[in-house]
Curated annotation (Swiss-Prot):
Pathway recorded for this protein: Carbohydrate degradation; glycolysis; pyruvate from D-glyceraldehyde 3-phosphate: step 4/5
Gene Ontology BP annotations: glycolytic process
Protein name, UniProt field: Enolase
The protein's assembly and partners: Component of the RNA degradosome, a multiprotein complex involved in RNA processing and mRNA degradation.
PANTHER family: ENOLASE (PTHR11902:SF1)
Length: 438
């Protein structure tokens, strides 16, 4: 189970962690893994705002005298002591064995002792150091871990209007996204999305609406309804000459757990309009029929499996239904969803599970069972762009990494542009989506 010791240049000779700041100004953990030949792999853990109840534990200090209780000195100490001691002199290329060693060292199901943030920062830094030691780009190293021979560039889910937990506004649905599916390359898709983002700003300004941005770089205006967010995006698409439903499709992240109260889905921004499970499912079905929506994430509460079953039966053959809080990147929970025919896609956030190896397990379990995979950032991000390499190296097909502003989001898009220039990787566009293939 434990990584074997090695005397070669790929031996781990030091591990160092520190507190850094994420895109919300909160502390997170960054780790360096240093090899015998001086090679350094560096990675940082992201942090979420709306989180699933079954996510692996993000260890925070709880000391109100520092960073309002959000410090991560305990996680840093765990890396600099226990994890460092356990991994010294191990072969950095033994990713699975190293991840298994950290899981065993923690000894809990949800990584409660060491913290998933501590373990993840080291797991990703190990992969980066290993890739450098073999003179491989990170995406190729990740591909080689699971013998992924064909690489693809992901379709970006671009979050251009923020609501819910990601913005201080009246919009209940957390993310309104565009998917540029009608293009032949990632770079052209990115250009189209960027043009629509700027067009949306002018549409909002012309209507006297706020153009400040939320956590993930999307605009955060106060709107009269969730549907109004869709209509202003449709205007922005048309204004720059693209066709909604052909060049560009729409996607929603409801983050429904955040407005699920006492068995009801309550839209506070629409006068506390209330729905039961079937009623809210029907509301989403109606939106998907009226507008070119090809993906709905967390359309229902993470515990409302009957509701998920109903929604999947209604539109699961036409619309991508993505489980985020529902599956929390956990292979065991995903398998339960597969068995019960719940949803048809999974959002992949590696800090929900805590190691690169377990993340890959979830991705390939989904692929094996015909579920789409969407690699995702968190609302609290850093300049770390590992998810870009993960998306290409696993041929995931889709990536969700925010809007077209804020350097913490753009860093991932820029890394994808670099990768596209380096490798032969197709951009599959419409073929990635259940309702658009053929």
């Amino acid at each position: 189970m434990y990584a074997e010791e090695t005397n070669n240049v790929t031996a781990i000779k030091d591990i160092r962690a520190r507190e850094i700041l994420d895109s919300r100004g909160n502390p997170t953990i960054e780790a360096d893994v240093i090899l015998a030949d001086g090679t350094i792999g560096r990675a940082a853990a992201p942090s979420g705002a709306s989180t699933g109840s079954r996510e692996a534990l993000e260890l925070r200090d709880g000391d109100q005298s520092r960073y309002m209780g959000k410090g991560v000195k305990k996680a840093v100490a765990n890396v600099n002591s226990q994890i460092r001691s356990a991994l010294m002199d191990k072969d950095v290329t033994a990713q699975q064995a190293i991840d298994d060693a950290m899981i065993a060292l923690d000894g809990t199901e949800n990584k409660d002792n060491l913290g998933a943030n501590a373990i993840l920062a080291v797991s990703l830094a190990v992969a980066k150091a290993a890739a450098k030691s073999q003179s491989l780009p990170l995406h190729q190293y990740i591909a080689d871990l699971r013998n992924q021979t064909s690489l693809t560039m992901p379709v970006p889910m671009m979050n251009i209007i923020n609501g819910g937990e990601h913005a201080d506004n009246t919009v209940d649905i957390q993310e309104f996204m565009i998917e540029p599916v009608g293009f032949s390359s990632f770079s052209e898709a990115l250009r189209a999305g960027t043009e629509i983002f700027h067009s949306l700003k002018s549409v909002l300004k012309s209507q006297g609406l706020n153009t400040a941005v939320g956590d993930e770089g999307g605009f955060a205006p106060n709107l009269r309804s969730n549907e109004e967010a869709i209509t202003v995006i449709m205007q922005a698409i048309e204004q720059v000459g693209y066709t909604a439903g052909k060049d560009i499709h729409l996607a929603l992240d409801c983050a429904a757990t955040e407005f699920y109260k006492d068995g009801k889905y309550v839209l506070a921004g629409e006068g506390n309009k209330s729905f039961d499970s079937q009623g809210f499912s029907d509301y989403l079905v109606g939106l998907a029929r009226q507008y070119p929506i090809i993906s709905i994430e967390d359309g229902l509460d993470e515990s409302d499996w009957d509701g998920w079953k109903y929604l999947t039966e209604q539109i699961g053959d036409k619309v991508q239904l993505v489980g985020d809080d529902l599956f929390v990147t956990n292979p065991a929970i995903l398998q339960e969803g597969i068995d019960k025919k719940i949803a048809n896609a999974i959002l992949i956030k590696f800090n929900q599970i805590g190691t690169l190896s377990e993340t890959l397990d979830a991705i390939y379990l989904a692929k094996k069972n015909g579920y789409a995979t969407v690699i995702s950032h968190r609302s609290g991000e850093t300049e770390d762009s590992t998810i870009a390499d993960l998306a290409v190296g696993t041929a995931a097909g889709q990536i969700k990494t925010g809007s077209l502003c804020r350097s913490d989001r753009v860093a991932k898009y820029n890394q994808l542009l670099r990768i596209e220039q380096q490798v032969r990787a197709s951009y599959r566009g419409r073929e990635e989506f259940i309702g658009l293939r053929g």
